[in-house]
Amino acid sequence: MATPMVSSAGGLLAMLNEPHPVLKLHALSNLNNLVDQFWPEISTSVPIIESLYEDEEFDLHQRQLAALLVSKVFYYLGELNDSLSYALGAGPLFDVSEDSDYVHTLLAKAIDEYASLRSKAVESNEMVDIDPRLEAIVERMLGKCISDGKYQQAMGIAIECRRLDKLEEAIIKSDNVQGTLSYCINVSHSFVNRREYRHEVLSLLVKVYQKLPSPDYLSICQCLMFLDEPQGVASILEKLLRSENKDDALLALQIAFDLVENEHQAFLLSVRDRLPAPKTRAVEATQAVETTIAPNENPSGDVQMADETPAQTIVHETDPVDATYAERLTKIKGILSGETSIQLTLQFLYSHNKSDLLILKTIKQSVEMRNSVCHSATIYANAIMHAGTTVDTFLRENLDWLSRATNWAKFSATAGLGVIHRGHLQQGRSLMAPYLPQGGAGGGGSPYSEGGALYALGLIHANHGEGIKQFLRDSLRSTNVEVIQHGACLGLGLSALGTADEEIYDDVKSVLYTDSAVAGEAAGISMGLLLVGTATEKASEMLAYAHETQHEKIIRGLALGIALTVYGREEGADTLIEQMTRDQDPIIRYGGMYALALAYSGTANNKAIRQLLHFAVSDVSDDVRRTAVLALGFVLYSDPEQTPRIVSLLSESYNPHVRYGAALAVGISCAGTGLSEAISLLEPLTSDVVDFVRQGALIAMAMVMVQISEASDSRVGVFRRQLEKIILDKHEDTMSKMGAILASGILDAGGRNVTIRLLSKTKHDKVTAVIGLAVFSQFWYWYPLIYFISLAFSPTAFIGLNYDLKVPKFEFMSHAKPSLFEYPKPTTVPTANTAVKLPTAVLSTSVKAKARAKKEAEQKAIAEKTSGPEKPVNESGSGKGKASTEKEGDSMQVDSPAAVEKKAPEPEPAFEILVNPARVVPAQEKYIKLLDDSRYVPVKLAPSGFVLLKDLREHEPEVLSLTDAPTSTASPATGTAAAAQGTPASAMAVDDEPQPPQAFEYAS
């Protein structure tokens, strides 16, 4: 008999008023099954059903059934709070495993409610009553996820609900614990907003990692770095270094390189100093050797060099185990101090330099001599274009032109050498010697070039200043000239970045208190650089002085300095940010925008974004509005795709300052990504009606397009041509021209071998890079700060290293067309008149003579029966002849079609074999593959950066790469040739420091 169709719930609802409990139970059971269909009708009787739930004489099961029914009715009515409240009353009848919209919606609501209560309890430090029934539902849900094998879902809920016990359970029970832990680290960086809670999660992960039979030490050390626990890292490194297994030592060296990539100088030095020295007898030997080498010690040499020599003597004096440890310790200390990676980067950038001097020549010729802004911009562009390559050919060839720089332009020109020679730690002092203050204050040279030289020393030793700090302090103390103080303050801030050195702080503070506008501005920035991320009490001292002084320059320097002190502190900086953003002085509010940007840098924190957007549209000062928009770039660089979307409306603002801020925000957060949306947003701004907006858009576009080839995005070629047009246009305004010149430098930065990277591969902020871009963005007020962009440059290189930290030759594959990632063609920027002069008249007699000579040469070659390999040389020679006289007589044209036919059918290969060390741009990383029969295997799979290699055929002799180095004896002419062709100048071991180029001075 078929079940009759129910057309109304009226009868069942009437039964609810019956006195007998069995009838009520029957009605509730059936209504529960029909509620999806008849909830509008049932909703009229909700008070009756509620009274049944509240009736304590009623059976528990029946009360729970009533609660479930009411919950479903409220769900359909859209009253989710009431629905959840009754669902909790339904107890086990609310089945978390049921696959229905009702259950999914209420579970989400329950988890949100529970998570917000747990967060509130922790953040307010107060007891918050949490309904045990709510907790029970969440726990049932977590248990179900774990039992169903949905570990990632369980971990997400556990992290959100601050249930670290359940998080640990989910990780341990998962089938791939290592993978689950990696996922968890990513989640904690991406989704955990509060810093303290993120630390709790990472501490738990370290605990779980350490319980594993074979811990992933690379990940553990990254977590410990986030937690700022140098002792933990030092213990792991010591354990690996003392291991008898060579692979463990390689792993320790790889960990050290990975930590160095995050650029946290104070942490790295702390780890280095905690690594225990070898046994006592070895230490005594060390001291003896140190006393003998002391007289020969180079005053500019880094402190670490003193540790390296004695380590070699220890090897012979201790037992083999300790000797091995001592040798490995020397290597790892060199890495942690940053020397090894800086040295290798310097050699890579020198040997692979592909900068195009023709571009600079074009800029120089098109810039009017009277225009000092464009003259300086050309010097900046040259420094950026050759950052870290040690190639100063352009300056040597144009000394007369360079000598036209006066006053602050001379300061900038000298400081530019610091960018070109960045990382030349051992020869930094000797390179800058001709310009440095001689014999105390006012040694006879120009104070501008002396100040610039001190700033240059800071740029050379940025974030690695152990060997130069004392010299800079002495220079600062021994002068009262504000220009020299300006350079010395910036140099000290750079070299002691983030070390919070009290003595240096006091020296800089005494300069600040002289109340000199020029020196005070640099002192304010320097204090910030020194105290980066310390969130120190000294910030309030700086703020108090900013209120006292009358100089805008000093207030601006201090405002930025205060912002730097709260770098990465997130909600810990909220009080200071509140204080600054409410200040009456617009310059301090401007500093407040930077404080917001840096405190929440790379977090994509909604609260910070909301505040910045609010100031961007509501502040009365254009400076503050511009900076508020620009600051979005810093908050969002970990999620660059978001930035163009968030600032797209602001980029169309009526206010040019807001448009400029939007351009630079995109430039900062999307730097080096070549993101299509970013380029589309910037394109209209490069032809804006306001000159400074065009300038900002051109610079931002270059930042986005750095290391992007024309083959991967045709707009890169269009942009290069646009820059050339602006530079060559006599009627273009100075602001745009300056933007175009700087953009040309950024586009080809570091000899076309560096990109701008704000995150390391382990998703840690690169402190130096973020700080560099923050100070660089101040160039609006002070052009010499442009050089800070060099701190954000990161080499696009794969540098494989063996156990001895040498660079062996080994091949690997880039599984993509070579044209996608090749260097730009060197002829991209022809000189203005070349195209017109190319067609030249050629006499027919000379054509015939050449043809005759060619024929004779070929016959002679056949007669001598030359060997096979020489034939292509002759062919290529004849090809050259054809190319150079392309439009000559008939006899030459006979060869042409054949040559064209030969070349035409060659298809481009689908892959490319690269040789270590190789240029690998970020977009190329996903195509990097190792060859199957390779002699070397990386300790960790990494497509770029410094990678330690395990040698599978140790008995075979090794061939080493990266032996090109600058020579000190090369004349300017040979230097030019070597730079243009990238030919090796002299062979040297990888451990040797490249020689400094010839010293030169330009007349004032």
Swiss-Prot record:
This is 26S proteasome non-ATPase regulatory subunit 1 homolog A. The modification Phosphoserine is found at residue 896. The modification N-acetylalanine is found at residue 2. Acts as a regulatory subunit of the 26 proteasome which is involved in the ATP-dependent degradation of ubiquitinated proteins. Signal peptide: none annotated. GO terms for molecular function: enzyme regulator activity. Ubiquitous with highest expression in flowers. GO terms for biological process: regulation of protein catabolic process. Keywords: Acetylation, Isopeptide bond, Phosphoprotein, Proteasome, Repeat, Ubl conjugation. There is a cross-link at residue 166 (Glycyl lysine isopeptide (Lys-Gly) (interchain with G-Cter in ubiquitin)). PC repeats lie at residues 412-447, 452-485, 487-521, 522-555, 557-590, 591-626, 627-659, 661-695, 696-736, 739-771. GO terms for cellular component: endoplasmic reticulum; proteasome complex. It comes from the Eukaryota. Residues 858-905, 959-1004 are annotated as: Disordered. Belongs to the proteasome subunit S1 family. Component of the 19S regulatory particle (RP/PA700) base subcomplex of the 26S proteasome. The 26S proteasome is composed of a core protease (CP), known as the 20S proteasome, capped at one or both ends by the 19S regulatory particle (RP/PA700). The RP/PA700 complex is composed of at least 17 different subunits in two subcomplexes, the base and the lid, which form the portions proximal and distal to the 20S proteolytic core, respectively. The gene is RPN2A. Pfam families: HEAT_2, PC_rep, RPN2_C, RPN2_N. Residues 965-987 have a biased composition (Low complexity).
